[in-house]
Curated annotation (Swiss-Prot):
Gene3D superfamilies linked to this entry: P-loop containing nucleotide triphosphate hydrolases
One of the Pfam families matching this protein, by short name: Thymidylate_kin
GO molecular-function term, one example from the UniProt record: dTMP kinase activity
EC number: 2.7.4.9
Record bears the keyword Membrane: no
Gene Ontology terms describing biological process: dTDP biosynthetic process; dTTP biosynthetic process; dUDP biosynthetic process
Residue numbers binding ATP: 7-14
Catalytic activity: dTMP + ATP = dTDP + ADP
Entry's Gene Ontology cellular component terms: cytoplasm
Family of the protein in this entry: Belongs to the thymidylate kinase family.
Keyword field: ATP-binding, Kinase, Nucleotide biosynthesis, Nucleotide-binding, Transferase
Record's protein name: Probable thymidylate kinase
């Protein structure tokens, strides 16, 4: 099972992935987590480029698009391991939400694995910006408003659940467990 957490920066993806991993581990599942960008050499290069002041320019965005697609290809074996539950902090869907043009992003990611379930953590842009570290050029209201709109437009193309990520860590975690439970053969009504 390949479950992807998506959402704008500051939505709480990392926190919620860890909480879901712990819960699934406790329920006897073999769980592995991945983060995009990865810790590969390509992923490290992506992280470095994201810090550049010109990271939002068209040229750098296209470069990042290619690098993210390459980084994804490096983890395909892990994503295709059906013996594990894979929880991913982002996927090619992030590239579709964050980068342009969409047709080109789709083309360079045509071999990316499609998630079995996408959990879109939805949070207000102002809340997101307040939660962010302000480490890169993308953590601003104008840009994140556009990205959020992109997510909401494209999410219907995937098997998904939209989770209100503004309700507090515990409530969000419970909502995620209830969304994931049926896929894992767990009674969602038994989750509190």
């Amino acid at each position: 099972m390949y479950i992807v957490f998506e959402g704008i920066d500051g939505a709480g993806k990392s926190t919620q992935i860890n909480l879901l991993k712990d819960w699934l581990d406790q329920n006897g599942f073999d769980v592995e987590t991945v983060v995009e960008p990865t810790d590969s050499e390509v992923g490290k290069l992506i992280r470095k480029i994201l810090q550049r002041p010109d990271a939002t320019t068209d040229r750098i965005q296209k470069t990042l698009g290619l690098l993210f697609a390459a980084d994804r290809m490096l983890i395909m074996d892990k994503l295709n391991d059906d013996s594990k539950v894979i929880l991913s902090d982002r996927s090619f869907i992030s590239s579709l939400a964050y980068q342009e043009p969409a047709e080109w992003i789709e083309q360079i990611n045509k071999y990316a694995k499609e998630p079995d379930l996408v959990l879109l953590l939805d949070v207000d842009v102002k809340t997101s910006v307040n939660r962010c570290s302000k480490e890169d050029e993308f953590e601003n209201e104008e840009f994140l408003s556009k990205v959020k709109a992109n997510y909401l437009d494209l999410i219907s193309n995937f098997n998904h659940e939209i989770i209100d990520a503004s309700t507090g860590v515990n409530k969000v975690s419970t909502d995620i467990k209830k969304a994931v439970a049926p896929y894992m053969g767990i009674c969602p009504d038994c989750i509190r």
